[in-house]
């Protein structure tokens, strides 16, 4: 019987691990809560309207379609039981593993200030990028109808917190009047 490899997460790490096992005599099960791989480095372009969500999301099954020893399951892993070597999904399904790779990604931290989220959205998902895009477009729509230059400037002023790659790319792709 082939060894069962379970990979939690279909991001860069999870896909890299799955592909590295292509020639191995194992069965690979990749589990993710989304059925697509998100190319996160381009999310800023979704937020600014340069790309659509479909341009940065590739179906996981398509990405691994030529890999005969891999399957993709949609599910939310809620528990790992090392004693029985099983992962448990939110729907109660259990999957046995001989080896487990956890590549679940990351999320933004508001350091105990979750109320900041409404004013400082993170940019880690298609949904967040789309929300930012809608907020930017709404601000431009409101500003276009204003005759008072001070009010108009207030609606067209955005603050980008973070000087990592995402923050720099977002700032660099925003209209000059908006930054």
Segments from the language model and where they lie:
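FAD-binding core/adjacent interface of flavoenzyme oxidoreductases
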Residues: 1-3, 70-159
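Beta1-alpha1 glycine-rich phosphate/pyrophosphate-binding loop at the start
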Residues: 1-73, 78, 158-159, 165-179
């Amino acid at each position: 019987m082939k060894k069962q490899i379970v990979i939690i997460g279909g991001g860069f790490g999870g896909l890299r691990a799955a592909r590295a096992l292509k020639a191995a005599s194992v069965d690979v099960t990749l589990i993710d809560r989304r059925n697509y791989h998100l190319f996160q480095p381009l999310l800023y372009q979704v937020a600014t309207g340069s790309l659509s969500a479909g341009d940065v999301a590739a179906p996981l099954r398509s990405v691994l379609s030529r890999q005969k020893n891999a399957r993709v399951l949609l599910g939310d892993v809620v528990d790992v039981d090392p004693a029985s070597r099983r992962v448990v999904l939110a729907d109660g399904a259990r999957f046995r593993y001989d080896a487990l790779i956890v590549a679940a990604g990351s999320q933004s931290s508001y350091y105990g200030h979750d109320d900041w989220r409404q004013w400082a959205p993170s940019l880690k998902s298609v949904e967040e990028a789309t929300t930012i895009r809608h907020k930017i477009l709404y601000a431009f729509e409101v500003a276009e109808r204003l005759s008072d230059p001070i009010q108009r400037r207030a609606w067209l002023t955005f603050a980008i917190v973070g000087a990592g790659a995402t923050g720099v790319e977002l700032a660099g792709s925003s209209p000059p009047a908006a930054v």
